[in-house]
Amino acid sequence: MTKQIARMIDHTALKPDTVKSEIEALCKEARVYGFASVCVNPCWVKLCAELLKESEVKVCTVIGFPLGAASPETKAFETRQAIADGAGEVDMVINIGALKDRDTGTVEHDIRAVTDAADGKALVKVIIETSLLTDEEKRLACELAVKAGADFVKTSTGFSGGGATVRDIKLMREAVGPDIGVKASGGVRDKESALAMIEAGATRIGASAGVSIVKGLTADEDY
């Protein structure tokens, strides 16, 4: 079971003050424990790709992060650059304001800019930022992500307050159906929480506490 959980974890370091030694430690831990990926800011993608080149651990990065307020063209450029640098997965933040305006065309175009730029070369996870949304908006965001060709929907950036909840994971799983991934991120700090998210329908866990989760400990980190 521990190995199965490890293969569902995106081992994460997204704080703005993260330093090189922390990224090196992140990659080493990911190799040792067999995590699905390391999730890092774009400036670290090349280093992670080099450190993980002979492993099964993927490099994941973030697009339009953490606000989602960049233009679709900027997000598309970020995506292409990340893939060129070695990323195999990208976690993009939607245009949250457009979603709340019910401007579905703009939201879908924003997501599709990234899925088109990824062009099958990287998995695309769509961060909907659940803490800022009503249930209706969460469902709509999930539906638009699926329509635009995303591979996953994801709860949170970890930068807007709140994080993953079992209730939201269930809602998102119901909204996307069985064939799209659901990533729980934000506040998953121990094995019990991770298992609860998985039982609710999560297929990936984003956490800086990956080592604590697989060891059955509790970490202090929020993301």
Swiss-Prot record:
Residues forming coiled coils: none
GO cellular component: cytoplasm
InterPro entries reported for this sequence: Aldolase_TIM (IPR013785), DeoC (IPR011343), DeoC/FbaB/LacD_aldolase (IPR002915), DeoC_typeI (IPR028581)
A GO molecular-function annotation: deoxyribose-phosphate aldolase activity
Keywords, in A-Z order: Cytoplasm, Lyase, Schiff base
Catalytic activity: 2-deoxy-D-ribose 5-phosphate = D-glyceraldehyde 3-phosphate + acetaldehyde
Pathway linked to the protein: Carbohydrate degradation; 2-deoxy-D-ribose 1-phosphate degradation; D-glyceraldehyde 3-phosphate and acetaldehyde from 2-deoxy-alpha-D-ribose 1-phosphate: step 2/2
Function as written in the Swiss-Prot or TrEMBL entry: Catalyzes a reversible aldol reaction between acetaldehyde and D-glyceraldehyde 3-phosphate to generate 2-deoxy-D-ribose 5-phosphate.
Catalytic residues identified in the record: D91, K154, K183
Taxonomic classification: Bacteria, Bacillati, Bacillota, Bacilli, Bacillales
Class of enzymatic activity (EC top level): lyase
Residues in the signal sequence: none
One BP term from GO: deoxyribonucleotide catabolic process
EC number: 4.1.2.4
Name of the protein described by the UniProt record: Deoxyribose-phosphate aldolase 1
Family: Belongs to the DeoC/FbaB aldolase family. DeoC type 1 subfamily.
Gene3D superfamilies, sorted: Aldolase class I (3.20.20.70)
Main location: cytoplasm
Cell location: Cytoplasm
Pfam families: DeoC
Keyword Transferase: no
